[in-house]
Amino acid sequence: MQRYWRFQDNKIQDICFGVLGESWIQRPVMARYYSEGQSLQQDDSFIEGVSDQVLVAVVVSLALTATLLYALLRNVQQNIHPENQELVRVLREQFQTEQDVPAPARQQFYTEMYCPICLHQASFPVETNCGHLFCGSCIIAYWRYGSWLGAISCPICRQTVTLLLTVFGEDDQSQDVIRLRQDVNDYNRRFSGQPRSIMERIMDLPTLLRHAFREVFSVGGLFWMFRIRIMLCLMGAFFYLISPLDFVPEALFGILGFLDDFFVIFLLLIYISIMYREVITQRLTR
């Protein structure tokens, strides 16, 4: 006695019997058609023809790309925030009254980069942790003359400024430059150790990583132990990216398997920025 497989869908069963005949629909053949029918019934994706894994990967990639573009392009905006315009106006008037004596030629560090406070070419520029550039004397005056209870907010984006990074070199040893370095160190000593949220650390990534990698590949920059730690982090991220052993293996989850790779690399970049901030803090205590 022959045993036959029965479809749950009677229409599919009638079509198979009519085309092949019931004698041909034996167990191996029926098993194959049954599995194909079940796979078609279970293939219910959000968009027909595109798997849900691909959709999730595309959405996550677009979100990360949008965040990165926002972090990179926000520095293009150089207009003073409306809440800070009054303080900046007072500072500009004070700078104009102090310019009775001709000022020395300004040293150029950034091509066509102007300070948003004094509206002149940036002189001995200082960069905030949010990535905006100002004259060193302008941002210090903005801090001194403002009624701040703690760290200042950026005159442009209103983000809390917890770190000032000098962009000019150490060749100039004039009295004004020495006083400016002391003021910058004083500010960093007060506010660089403030607790930071995870979102604030992410927003600081482009600026801190740029300064960290610049010092890694410069002579007399960071000490060798910190350089070795950065190299180990980069090597660990590279080997994890090419390793077949993953928390979310690509063989099982397809494109979604790459998300954990990018997440690990992202965490390592945040760790490098935290280390660099600690190095700057240690310099202030020497």
Swiss-Prot record:
**Entry keyword annotation includes Zinc:** yes
The enzyme class is: transferase
Its annotated pathway reads: Protein modification; protein ubiquitination
In short, the EC number is: 2.3.2.27
* Gene Ontology CC annotation, any one: endoplasmic reticulum membrane
Q: Where in the cell is it found?
A: Endoplasmic reticulum membrane
Keywords linked to the UniProt accession: Endoplasmic reticulum, Membrane, Metal-binding, Transferase, Transmembrane, Transmembrane helix, Ubl conjugation pathway, Zinc, Zinc-finger
Read off the CDD domains from this record. Answer: RING-HC_RNF170
Molecular function GO labels: ubiquitin protein ligase activity; zinc ion binding
Highest taxon of source: Eukaryota
Impact noted for substituting residue 130 to S:
Loss of E3 ligase activity
TM helices/strands, residue ranges: 53-73, 230-250, 252-272
| Residue ranges that the UniProt entry lists as topological domain Lumenal | 1-52, 251
Report the principal subcellular site. Answer: endoplasmic reticulum
Give the RING-type zinc finger regions: 115-158
PANTHER family recorded: E3 UBIQUITIN-PROTEIN LIGASE RNF170, RING-TYPE DOMAIN-CONTAINING PROTEIN
UniProt protein name:
E3 ubiquitin-protein ligase RNF170
**Could you tell me which species this protein originates from?**
Mus musculus
